[in-house]
Regions:
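A glycine-rich, hydrophobic/aromatic-adjacent loop/helix-cap motif
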Residues: 1-155
């Protein structure tokens, strides 16, 4: 399966930490998508957030007509054990199949979605409370957040 990475996965070194068995690391372009800092991370990210200045957003992607997104592409065998860890780590994302210029088949992209859809599809109330509610977080997908400063060191 081909993964389209846009944050830390733009680095082959970081991608290999996530998917040790990846093959064919290269760049690609997604038309109609853009990067956005639009959601709060879970409890592990509490130490990098600055709530008072709203500098607490993690990177995600969203559809946007006319935009183009450079991504890292990597082929990851479906039997790769690290898939399970990846899905757990990226729990709050919507996994979507996207068309990539020059690829005969879609790639998987971690995309933004709404709190309502996230809670309805992937994170029922008890799970949401465990991940976010106990820390006073009532919504994670927002459009007024600023990037957590830690992320900006990569740009």
């Amino acid at each position: 399966m081909t993964v389209a990475g846009f944050g830390a996965l733009l680095s082959e070194r970081s991608s290999r930490m996530t998917f040790p068995a990846l093959r064919n690391f290269r760049t690609g372009r997604l038309r109609g998508w853009r990067r956005v800092f639009a959601h709060r991370g879970g409890a592990p990210f509490r130490h990098i957030e600055r709530v008072e200045t709203k500098e607490m957003a993690s990177l995600s992607c969203e559809p946007h007509a006319g935009s183009e997104l450079v991504v890292a592409l990597m082929d990851v065998p479906l039997e790769e054990p690290s898939w399970a860890d990846f899905v757990v780590r990226e729990h709050e994302y919507r996994f979507v199949a996207v068309a990539v210029d020059g690829l005969p088949r879609p790639a998987v992209l971690c995309a933004a979605w709404t709190d309502e859809d996230y809670r309805r599809v992937r994170c029922p109330d008890a799970e949401y409370h465990r991940r976010y509610g106990q820390y006073g977080i009532d919504r994670i997908w927002r459009d007024y957040l600023l990037p957590a400063r830690l992320y900006l060191r990569h740009w």
